[in-house]
Every structure is written in structure tokens, then in C-alpha cells.
Regions:
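Extracytoplasmic/periplasmic beta-strand context in beta-sandwich domains
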Residues: 106, 148, 194-197, 246
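Conserved small/polar residues in nucleotide/adenosyl-binding loops
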Residues: 238-244
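Extracytoplasmic entry segments of secretory-pathway proteins
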Residues: 1-135
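Short pre-active-site segment immediately N-terminal to redox-active cysteine/selenocysteine motifs
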Residues: 182, 233-234
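Membrane-embedded segments
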Residues: 135-186, 190-194
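Electrostatic cytochrome c docking/interface patches
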Residues: 123-124, 204-231
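Interdomain boundary/hinge segments at the C-termini of tandem beta-sandwich modules
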Residues: 200-202
């Protein structure tokens, strides 16, 4: 039942800690719904029970001004719920911020309006993050211009990218496939087009891909190599629409 609800509300879970985040969300959601229904039901019930009816004499309610049992419940139940949420949340948070020692480190750079990914062996990809499955991946994020935010929904991973500063996030992908990456911080006219893909491969396939990364350029003529580097590194002005007043 919970798995079906998760699939309905969220993208699929493709990281080791995605289920922790989703389960915590649903715990908070259902706890809030339960408390809401209890309060609303109590208000409606008491409003109906003690409403004044025509032809009846006014009835005085009980003169009892407090209940130790009710007051204890009003304190203890929220305390238990908040304590569970705190412990659950801090454990999930620590899983998300403590990077395993054996993680593959990849540098992520945001720039208006595309992403570049620099790999340990010196290779670079544009708008395609390639990672192995069942292997922790550490992303070191920064920006060349304005504030961006790097978000992989299926990994439940999101982190801001700031100029002159490095932020770190990590994930361990559990399923091979191609998934979406978004920028979730408004960064200019091309913000909505600043998407990318994360490609999760089997470890052996990733090792083969990584060993060939960059080597395909070795035999290229210099003019073709220069054109390829320009395409990878230069800003794509096809995404840039300047107002006519800019030229005035």
C-alpha cells in the first residue's frame, strides 16, 4: 500500500536513502491528517451536541474547568510524535551528509544554462552525469556565475551551487537507467531549459566507459577537436533571448 502511494506521489526510488525520506514524509503526513481529523471531528461533535434547540431551555455545561487526563494527552502525544520525527529525521540527514570513504568524486559545475561534469581521470561531459550502480558517488558542486540548485528527484538529492564556494552531496544509485536532473533555483531566462540527465550503468560498463572517456579525441584533427571543445565549453547562445533595450 505504501509503495503504491509512494509511486503515485513521488518519482521512483533510485538511491539507498530515498525510502527513508519518503517514509518519513508519509509518517509526518499521516500524523498531521490524524491530528487534523481528531480536532475537526471534536469541534463538529461538540458543536452539534451542545447547540441550542428551539423550544428547549438553556442547559449549562459542566463546571469542570480542566482534565488531567486530557491535558496529559495533549502534551504527551505531540511530544512522542515530534520526538519520533526528530530522531528519524536526524538519522536520515546523517545518512545524506556523511559521504562514504570509497565514493567516486565528480566535480559538478553549474553555468547559465548548462551543467559540466569533471571525472577523476580528467574526462568531462556536458549535461550528462554518468555513474555506476551500487557504488557511492560524491558530487562537489560549484557555480561559475549565479546561484543554481542541482536536483535529482529519483535520488532524493538536492544541493545549491554557489559561486566561489563548494557544496557536497552524494548518492548510491540502486537501479540502472536514465533519469532527469533539474536546476531548481531561478537563474535567468534559460532556467527552465537547464536540464540534464544522470545515466546509471552497471559497474563493469561504467569502468569501460570511463576508460574510453576522452580517448576518442586522440585521433581527431585539430580543427575538429577545437570545434568539439568549443561546443562543450562555450555557452549555448541559442538559449539566450536578450531584450531589445539591451542594445540601446
Amino acid at each position: 500500500m505504501l509503495d503504491r502511494l509512494t509511486e503515485f506521489f513521488f518519482p521512483k526510488q533510485v538511491s539507498t536513502f530515498a525510502s527513508d525520506i519518503d517514509n518519513l514524509y508519509f509518517f509526518i503526513f499521516y500524523s498531521s491528517v490524524a491530528l487534523f481529523l481528531i480536532v475537526v471531528f471534536g469541534m463538529v461533535y461538540l458543536s452539534i451536541k451542545y447547540r441550542h434547540r428551539k423550544g428547549e431551555e438553556l442547559k449549562l455545561t459542566s463546571s469542570k474547568d480542566h482534565s488531567n487526563l486530557l491535558e496529559s494527552m495533549f502534551f504527551i502525544i505531540p511530544l512522542i510524535l515530534v520526538s519520533i520525527t526528530f530522531v528519524w529525521g536526524i538519522r536520515s540527514y546523517l545518512k545524506m551528509v556523511i559521504v562514504p570513504d570509497d565514493a567516486i568524486e565528480i566535480k559538478v559545475t553549474g553555468q547559465s544554462w548548462f551543467w559540466t561534469f569533471d571525472y577523476p581521470d580528467g574526462g568531462t561531459t556536458l549535461n550528462e552525469l554518468v555513474v555506476p550502480s551500487n557504488k557511492p558517488v560524491k558530487l562537489v558542486l560549484s557555480s561559475k556565475d549565479v546561484l543554481h540548485s542541482f536536483f535529482i528527484p529519483v535520488m532524493r538529492s538536492k544541493m545549491d551551487c554557489l559561486p566561489n564556494r563548494y557544496n557536497v552531496m552524494w548518492f548510491d544509485a540502486t537501479k540502472e537507467g536514465v533519469y532527469d536532473i533539474f536546476c531548481t533555483e531561478y537563474c535567468g531566462t534559460g532556467h527552465s531549459q537547464m536540464g540534464a540527465k544522470v545515466i546509471v550503468m552497471q559497474p563493469a560498463q561504467y569502468e569501460e566507459w570511463a576508460s574510453e572517456l576522452g580517448s576518442e579525441d586522440d585521433d581527431l584533427p585539430l580543427d575538429e577537436l577545437g570545434a568539439k571543445l568549443y561546443t562543450k565549453k562555450a555557452v549555448s547562445y541559442t538559449h539566450l533571448t536578450l531584450p531589445t533595450t539591451w542594445l540601446v
